[in-house]
Amino acid sequence: MASSTFFSDWNQLIKPRVTSLVLATIIPGLYLASEQPPSVFLITVTLFGTFLMSSASFIFNQVIERDRDAKMKRTSNRPIPSERISIPQATLVGISMMGLSFYMLTVYVNLLTALCALTALISYVFLYTIFLKPRTTQNIVIGGVAGCVGPLIGYAAIGNSLPIQAWILFTMIFLWTPAHFWALAIFLKEDYSDANFPMLPVVKGINQTTKSIFFYTILYSLSCVSFYFLEPSMGLLYLVIVLLVCIWMGILSYRLIQNPERQAARKFFLFSIFHLFLINITIVVDHMI
């Protein structure tokens, strides 16, 4: 039982399921940046190094937000506010993960890749968690930069450069992020209100939030389609799949305006995760065939 609790607690701290989506956004860059497929070793080190850096950022986030987490029903049982893991212990593990990640990526990949990963951590911890999240409804719009760095890491790992295609994929995720997290904020509105986080549904109301979700969904969909025209290796497979899933995502966001209920927001939230996974997988598959 103690062993099960130990692994469960650290699993909550490092959030591997969330990190898996970040890792998925790295893979297109690994394949698009070179005509030759990347080595298994390079893929493994890049993904594992990023996993460590992402895990460290989530640990630091929960150390900083421990008092607010204690006020939220969804997060009150996390290991730090419930005191199953101490602040010094979590901080030490976070620093160790961050240091090991930077070392691995610098030595076995390149310095640019390590700096991209470290920039993501710094922006998530300092820009988003400390500065923006407690202060503005636009916290996730600006602070979401941290979650967009995956494509930069992928391209940097292979080519030691950041070409325009990397920034296009960065922009796609940047436009995906607000709609995704505002949908989450709708069905967790009371929790965020209890913790005094100025999330958009709390401050502006759900109706305004659903309109903003629709707006960003359209921008995100347009960016997905534009990648077909800006990346020469993309073929009809990518275009067809993108059109289908973007149309459906647009329909879901419009339905959310008409029916701004928690269940509809949750449905959009879950589909947005599937959408981003599918887009990144499709990019790789289309490039390889």
UniProtKB/Swiss-Prot annotation:
GO terms for cellular component: plasma membrane. One of its GO terms (molecular function) is protoheme IX farnesyltransferase activity. It is an enzyme of class 2 (transferase). It comes from the Bacteria. InterPro entries: Protohaem_IX_farnesylTrfase, UbiA_prenyltransferase, UbiA_sf. Its main location: membrane. Converts heme B (protoheme IX) to heme O by substitution of the vinyl group on carbon 2 of heme B porphyrin ring with a hydroxyethyl farnesyl side group. This is Protoheme IX farnesyltransferase. The lineage of its organism: Bacteria, Pseudomonadati, Spirochaetota, Spirochaetia, Leptospirales.
